[in-house]
Amino acid sequence: MNRFPDNARVVFIGDSITAANLTLPYIIHTYKTQKIASGIRFFNCGVAGGTAEFARISYDTDIARHKPTHAVVSFGINDSHRDLLANPRSKERQDALYAAYENYKANMTALVDRLHADGISVTLCTPAPYDEYTESKTPALHGGFALMQGYAEFVRTLAKEKGTELCDIHAKVSYLLETDPLISDDHIHPTNHGYFTLARIILAEQGIDIGEEMPIPDYFSRWHSYVAPLRCVLASECMIVRDFNAPTEQKMKMMSTRVENQDWIQPVFERFIRTYVEYKPQEAELYRMIDLTYEEDIF
């Protein structure tokens, strides 16, 4: 995996693991403090609940706007429809899992093709493993680890077919899990230590030593205060609105009605819906402030 050059514009495209914005700051900080490249810009294009399909749908709005030269792409856990594993084995379950996998392959291939057509250098990351075997308070889905192994293997194949660079997150994290608790009780999302480790893995692939583990530096706080609500708006589009190209007025009316009726669909969505109603009208300003605070505070 080559280092990003001077003046590169690097988008990190992925799901909630990317959107959490707990790995990218370490990569930016390392590039900055070790003076690896000048004039470089990094952009968080992660979406909680995101899939390769949603990345294609939101591409022009959320990815192409940054005029990227490089893209680091990681999807799989949401594309897999892993919750089907909670159902008893049946032909219907098998068919649904297979359909999800075929859909993932088609959308990942199309996403890479679009990035290449736009002249963007692509690094594909295999999805992080589903941590099926570490004991936790939350019961694991039987077969989750094997499911994500299949998705990781496809990404390895796709990288070879398309001539992209590859960062094999799945293999490296799977190995480390034997002795290092990197993933939280939900078996999917990293711990804070896990997010740092992801940055270490990516940078190590570029021949860069991140150094000792540390908290995210304070100078990222203002930038993150704009990244977080914007990523939440996109997550709401993906998981709740589910009609990205509908008129904004229609989407705002639907989400405002949910707030008025306290209709959250499920409790975890309350924060997303409230954030959407507050910040969707400010979406363009959030993008502007992300760029401004990056320039003023970070790089």
Model-based region annotation:
Residues S90-C125, F154, L158, K162-T164:
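Charged, glycine-enriched surface loops/patches
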Residues S74, N78, N87, L111-A146:
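Active-site segments of SGNH/GDSL-like serine hydrolases
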Residues A48, E92-N103, P139-A146, H189:
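The substrate-binding groove and active-site-proximal loops of carbohydrate-active enzymes
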Residues E132-I169:
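Substrate-gating cap/lid alpha-helix
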Residues S16-A19, A48-A52, I77-R82, A128-E132, ...:
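Solvent-exposed loop/turn segments at secondary-structure junctions
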Residues M1-A48, E53, S58-A71, L198, ...:
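Serine-esterase "nucleophile elbow" of acetyl-processing enzymes
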Residues T138-L141, T179-H187:
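Flexible glycine/proline-enriched surface loops and loop-helix/loop-strand junctions
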Residues D6, E161, L182-F299:
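Conserved catalytic region of serine esterases and O-acyltransferases that act on ester linkages
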